[in-house]
């Protein structure tokens, strides 16, 4: 019998881990430079936490039983868990709170393909307790800084506004809004044509789908619609954000007011980061504003504004493979310490520790015996170990360089 990982799970070998860490370390440096602090939340959540506000679909969650009455699930994303943590464990925190994470998430998939991946890695931020123009701009510019730190230049950001889109959908019959919303989210014009809508509403749905393109064109189109005062204010806020992003340098921006995320807790801007270098566009990350989510967990139902994003480590990895930036080998040890006789064993361990105690990172292995001198040298060459320290019976080292 060959033992395999669970369906949808996978193992990361040392070189895979090095590549993953290369990405994560560079993102973490950016998060630190922007003043964000890491938060780690539980992988396992109560289902009522994950389902609060019905923003997350139950079928997305991999559920577990703990032998009691509690329904438990593996987190399918991080924002809900962080929202719960902040309002229940950080009640006296000062705002804004700048938090970042680097963690795995689990999502059930219902595709027929065997072993469809269900565990994913994400890195992202949550900016809590700040609403408005500057907070929105900070998060979008932080996205750009993250991609620059990874050496990625060919990408664009698709920016929508969930509040505007939701208000434009309010004109549709209540029993059809979910279907219209889903059709618009998937740019599914065929479904729109088959729904029992009046010609006016069908045209409205098609117009919403067409609110995509260069920012100036989309803002002009949406401004020409029959908008109420609240909708017009949201459009003006979006215009101010676009102007700020594009004020100093060209920000690769596409406005898309048909953009709807499958996780439905967003109340303001929503966005996707898309890679431009492949024939098929690859979404590298998603995010948006969620000003009512924290209120679902707050004991007094107090709303605290929030905005954040998550970047997919897997998708970044796939894009970076072609750039040759990722590590090609695991780091080699600097020394192989070899006791020449049994009486030199203690001295070998002591010498190896002396090397490890250096202020610089020095990787040191101890030879564990069972090989002659030539086999030891071959092992060191195979592992790209630069130097062998032969420890004599009198504890003195003899350094042999293999380069």
Curated annotation (Swiss-Prot):
SUPFAM superfamilies attached to this UniProt entry: Class II aaRS and biotin synthetases (SSF55681)
GO cellular component: cytoplasm
GO terms under biological process: histidyl-tRNA aminoacylation; L-histidine biosynthetic process
MF-aspect GO terms: histidine-tRNA ligase activity
Predominant place of localization: cytoplasm
UniProt pathway annotation: Amino-acid biosynthesis; L-histidine biosynthesis; L-histidine from 5-phospho-alpha-D-ribose 1-diphosphate: step 1/9
InterPro entries, sorted: aa-tRNA-synth_II, aa-tRNA-synth_II/BPL/LPL, HisRS-like_core, HisRS/HisZ, HisZ
Keyword terms, alphabetized: Amino-acid biosynthesis, Cytoplasm, Histidine biosynthesis
Subcellular compartments: Cytoplasm
Classification via Gene3D superfamilies: Bira Bifunctional Protein, Domain 2 (3.30.930.10)
Family in the record: Belongs to the class-II aminoacyl-tRNA synthetase family. HisZ subfamily.
Subunit note: Heteromultimer composed of HisG and HisZ subunits.
Other facts: This function is generally fulfilled by the C-terminal part of HisG, which is missing in some bacteria such as this one.
Function per UniProt: Required for the first step of histidine biosynthesis. May allow the feedback regulation of ATP phosphoribosyltransferase activity by histidine.
Listed name of the protein: ATP phosphoribosyltransferase regulatory subunit
Annotated source species: Nostoc punctiforme (strain ATCC 29133 / PCC 73102)
Lineage per the UniProt record: Bacteria, Bacillati, Cyanobacteriota, Cyanophyceae, Nostocales
Gene: hisZ
């Amino acid at each position: 019998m060959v033992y395999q990982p669970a369906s949808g799970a996978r193992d990361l070998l040392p070189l895979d881990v090095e590549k993953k860490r290369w990405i994560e370390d560079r993102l973490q440096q950016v998060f630190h430079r922007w003043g964000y602090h890491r938060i780690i939340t539980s992988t396992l959540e109560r289902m009522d936490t994950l389902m609060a506000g019905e923003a997350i679909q139950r079928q997305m969650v991999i559920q577990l039983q703990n032998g009691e009455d509690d329904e438990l699930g593996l987190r399918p994303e991080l924002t809900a868990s962080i929202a719960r943590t902040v309002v229940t464990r950080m009640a006296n925190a000062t705002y804004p709170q700048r938090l970042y994470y680097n963690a795995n998430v689990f999502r059930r998939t219902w595709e027929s393909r065997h072993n469809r991946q269900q565990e994913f890695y994400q890195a992202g931020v949550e900016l809590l307790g700040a609403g408005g123009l500057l907070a929105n701009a900070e998060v979008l510019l932080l996205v750009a800084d993250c991609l620059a730190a990874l050496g990625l230049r060919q990408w664009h950001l698709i920016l929508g506004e969930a509040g505007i889109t939701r208000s434009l959908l309010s004109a549709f019959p209540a029993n059809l809004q979910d279907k219209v919303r889903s059709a618009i989210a998937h740019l599914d014009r065929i479904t729109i044509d088959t729904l029992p809508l009046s010609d006016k509403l069908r045209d409205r749905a098609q117009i919403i789908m067409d609110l995509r393109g260069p920012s100036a064109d989309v803002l002009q189109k949406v401004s020409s619609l029959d908008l109420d005062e609240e909708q017009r204010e949201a459009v003006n806020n979006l215009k101010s954000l676009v102007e700020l992003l594009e004020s100093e340098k060209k920000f690769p921006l596409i406005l898309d007011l048909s953009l709807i995320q499958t996780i439905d807790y967003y109340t303001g801007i929503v966005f996707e980061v898309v890679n431009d270098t492949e024939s098929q566009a690859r979404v590298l990350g998603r995010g948006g504003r969620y000003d009512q989510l924290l209120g679902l967990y707050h004991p007094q139902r107090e709303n605290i504004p929030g905005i954040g994003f998550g970047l997919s480590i897997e998708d970044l990895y796939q894009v970076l493979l072609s750039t040759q930036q990722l590590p090609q080998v695991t780091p080699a040890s600097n020394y192989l310490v070899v006791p020449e006789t049994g009486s030199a064993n203690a001295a070998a361990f002591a010498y190896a520790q002396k090397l490890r105690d250096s202020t610089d990172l020095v990787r040191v292995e101890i030879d564990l015996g069972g090989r002659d001198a030539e086999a030891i040298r071959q092992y060191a060459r195979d592992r790209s170990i630069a130097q062998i320290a032969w420890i004599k019976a009198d504890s003195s080292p003899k350094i042999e360089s293999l380069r």
